[in-house]
Amino acid sequence: MKFQLHCRDHEARRGTLTLAHGTVETPAFMPVGTYGAVKGLSPDELHTLGAGIILGNTFHLWLRPGLEVIGAHGGLHRLMNWDGPILTDSGGFQVFSLGALRKICEEGVRFRSPVNGDTCFLTPEESMRIQQVLNSDIVMIFDECTPYPVDMQIAESSMQLSLRWAERSKTAHAGNPNALFGIVQGGMYESLRDHSAAGLCAIGFDGYAIGGLSVGEPKADMQRILRHTAPQLPADKPRYLMGVGTPEDIVHAVAQGIDLFDCVLPTRNARNGWLYTSQGILRLRNSRYRLDTSPPDEHCDCYTCRHFTRAYLHHLQRTGEMLGARLNSLHNLHYYQRLMANIRKAIETGQFEQFARKFSGQDFMLKCASV
């Protein structure tokens, strides 16, 4: 892996990330393909949209289709016929999401499979082995996602466990030529975030992620922790904010020096009939669009906006036609990829601060509420 920074505009960074399966222009947004597919879209469509890297989920792919199937294809790229880079989450967040179904100990996490009820045991070593079979371009360490809300004592214990698992992850990753990223934890406590970041930097990783955010905390707390944590990470390594977020969240995080993002919002909201547009969020189920023959966004050149009207998409949403979810997903992911391209251009030209004003504060939120 090679990461090259080309320029900055204050803390916002413009770079290039070179990985085994290709080059990623940063800041970049990674569409989420949890089960080895971005819901409803083909790899060719993702390329056309401008996606340079996608995300897969170790936990879910381990359970289905399983390592035997993935290994028979020679890895996740050939299984899903995607020739670009792939980042895989380690499974820590998904195990955290199981709640009472899982039991955490020093060695790892024991849980009941949500697929068939079998008892499973996931450790840092097993997570690294799975991701090696997947042949992920970027491998994430196995960590415990600190719950929210939680008191400082529990958050510290969780953070320390994640640091010990980080060391084990790096040891188990030895010999794998693909990149390995550490994950900063520590909940909503700045001092714990400092300790986590320092510990990970001492171990040494190819890149660093900020985890444990967008887990139910108020946005003000998320932004506070992000502002505090990002400067603690090495300037010459890529920085990844996990699971975030809205267009406004992304622009705010780029201003703090973040390079990589992933989130299910564009595709999940697409399936629910929410489209991101230059005028804010368009809610297709609203009856006001029943006779609206205008495109979803007059300023968008995606396939959906060039070929279909709001009235037709409203009809598809109301009738539950799968074409509607596909067309909406094409539009939303195009919106996100265009947003990232515009961010990169703004940084290159020294105009990022002006660009960010369009997505900050009350003006953008009023647009979202009124379209």
UniProtKB/Swiss-Prot annotation:
Binding annotation for Zn(2+): 300, 302, 305, 331
Molecular function via GO: metal ion binding; tRNA-guanosine(34) queuine transglycosylase activity
InterPro entries reported in the protein's UniProt record: ArchSynthase1/Queuine_TRR, TGT, TGT-like_sf, tRNA_ribo_trans-like
Keyword Metal-binding attached: yes
Catalysed reaction, written as an equation: 7-aminomethyl-7-carbaguanine + guanosine(34) in tRNA = 7-aminomethyl-7-carbaguanosine(34) in tRNA + guanine
Active site as annotated: 89, 262
Note describing how the cofactor binds: Binds 1 zinc ion per subunit.
Gene3D superfamilies: Queuine tRNA-ribosyltransferase-like
Region (RNA binding), start-end ranges: 243-249, 267-271
GO terms under cellular component: cytosol
Amino acids binding substrate: 89-93, 143, 185, 212
Pathway: tRNA modification; tRNA-queuosine biosynthesis
SS bond list: none
Cofactor: Zn(2+)
EC number: 2.4.2.29
The keyword Zinc belongs to this UniProt entry's keyword annotation: yes
Entry keywords, A to Z: Glycosyltransferase, Metal-binding, Queuosine biosynthesis, Transferase, tRNA processing, Zinc
GO biological process: queuosine biosynthetic process; tRNA wobble guanine modification; tRNA-guanine transglycosylation
Described purpose of this protein according to its UniProt entry: Catalyzes the base-exchange of a guanine (G) residue with the queuine precursor 7-aminomethyl-7-deazaguanine (PreQ1) at position 34 (anticodon wobble position) in tRNAs with GU(N) anticodons (tRNA-Asp, -Asn, -His and -Tyr). Catalysis occurs through a double-displacement mechanism. The nucleophile active site attacks the C1' of nucleotide 34 to detach the guanine base from the RNA, forming a covalent enzyme-RNA intermediate. The proton acceptor active site deprotonates the incoming PreQ1, allowing a nucleophilic attack on the C1' of the ribose to form the product.
NCBIfam families per record: Q_tRNA_tgt, tgt_general
Family per similarity comment: Belongs to the queuine tRNA-ribosyltransferase family.
Protein name: Queuine tRNA-ribosyltransferase
